[in-house]
């Protein structure tokens, strides 16, 4: 049995937390984005935008990569039928990743926090198609990456807000409203934040 060690959250690192783009974010790709940080160290950071959608549907993606055939589309479990594909970020946009609850583990699974893991192999897609796999999961194509010190600088320059990442907020299906709900969760008045951002 493979033992997976949970990552430690060292001082100043944001593993397992959300980034919320501040109004006026200069990079349009991240405007009003919510990013879940999976890895953050002196060597840089990586995470996934979780509130942007890809145009491809999960069943079609399974068919495109050969996990299922055309004839299998009608027998997919309801969960797989309705699963959406997120735009995880601008890096490696054809590569798939699954963030999921810690009730699914294979050798390639990477623990992200106490209850969230990351798997980037086709095995987990087959498990979800078969009606198994983790209880909670989200699929993303591409990821967001930062060079050493880059994320720290962007946070210090008020490019991002940071907050804890409740599981319900990470995995729920209200993608369009996620940014606003997290702002409310943090007690932030968006109208005031936008107004303040417009002043030097």
Swiss-Prot record:
It holds the Pfam family DUF179. One of its GO terms (cellular component) is cytosol. Signal peptide: none annotated. This is UPF0301 protein BCAN_A0487. Gene3D superfamilies: VC0467-like (3.40.1740.10). PANTHER family: UNCHARACTERIZED PROTEIN YQGE, UPF0301 PROTEIN YQGE. It comes from Brucella canis (strain ATCC 23365 / NCTC 10854 / RM-666). Belongs to the UPF0301 (AlgH) family. InterPro entries: AlgH-like (IPR003774).
């Amino acid at each position: 049995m493979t033992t997976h060690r949970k990552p430690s959250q060292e001082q100043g690192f944001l593993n397992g937390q959300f980034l919320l783009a501040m109004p006026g974010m200069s990079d349009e790709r991240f405007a009003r984005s919510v990013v879940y940080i999976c890895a953050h160290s002196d060597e840089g950071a990586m995470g996934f935008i979780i509130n942007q959608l890809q145009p491809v549907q999960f069943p079609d993606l399974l068919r495109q990569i050969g996990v299922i055939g055309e004839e299998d589309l009608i027998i997919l479990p309801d969960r797989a039928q309705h699963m959406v594909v997120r735009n995880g970020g601008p890096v490696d946009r054809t590569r798939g990743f699954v963030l999921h609850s810690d009730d699914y583990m294979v050798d390639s699974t990477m623990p992200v926090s106490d209850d969230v893991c990351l798997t980037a192999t086709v095995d987990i897609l087959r498990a979800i198609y078969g009606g198994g796999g983790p209880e909670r999961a989200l699929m993303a194509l591409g990821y967001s990456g930062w060079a050493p010190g880059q994320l720290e600088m962007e946070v210090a320059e008020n490019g991002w807000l940071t907050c804890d990442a409740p599981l319900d907020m990470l995995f729920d299906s209200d993608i369009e409203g996620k940014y606003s709900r997290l702002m409310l969760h943090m007690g932030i008045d968006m109208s005031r934040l936008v107004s303040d951002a417009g002043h030097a």
